Amino acid sequence: MLFFLLEDPFVWNFPLLAGLIILCAIYIVLLRTYTEIKIYDKQPLLFFLSLTILYITIGSPLSSINHLSFSLHMIQMSLLFFVIPPLFLLGIPEASLLVIKRLNIPFLAALVTFAILFFFYHLQAVLTYLSLHSYIHNSYLLLLMVLSLLIWQPIVTEQNKRFAFLSGIVLLPACSLLILSGLFGSGTNPLLSGMMASLCITPSALNSLSILPPPFNTRADLIIAGLLMMGIHKFALLLTVRLKNKILARDLTGSG
């Protein structure tokens, strides 16, 4: 069954790949025109890495696997909102980020909005509805992605420890929802149900399928998903600080 989901060549998102290649080309031109940063320096490599992870996460056949269980889905969400944004922002020269800072964007409002939308996203009724309406689902995820970039901007540019701490606090409701659903809920996966519906597989047939072994698609899977989200977010914060310090050290020494 898993092989069937991955064998279709059309699950590769070639329009997205073309768009990312164009974005990389524009980045290289701007980098060579307005900065002295070399393509092989840390910042460009982080920028390219962020786009590579983005494509693997949502544009490759691996994106099909993310719907098979909540823990795999949460890894995808964590990469999209906690790993890719800081890598992307770290890859942008400091002068450009300072221009964004001067716009006086209400980053705290973006953080609260993200937390609310992210919490509602993991309510079973909302997730069931979104899984059956792909355009609305993709628009919802795009909005969360934009908000996540705004959230990480003060953490990357200012190394704002207070804001970083708040970003972890506001994620607790969504993490707690998954963990409590695993402890007291049914353990059902609306994303998997939506995928099977698109393949014309009935609920009774779905129950008889063993796509992934335990603890996937069980209550334990929801608990693992909640813990994964907290762990990856914390890891992303620590990684961002470390990479930022290396970039600052490079700027001081003048080496790549």
What are these regions, as identified by a protein language model?
Residues 1-256:
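Alpha-helical membrane segments of multi-pass proteins
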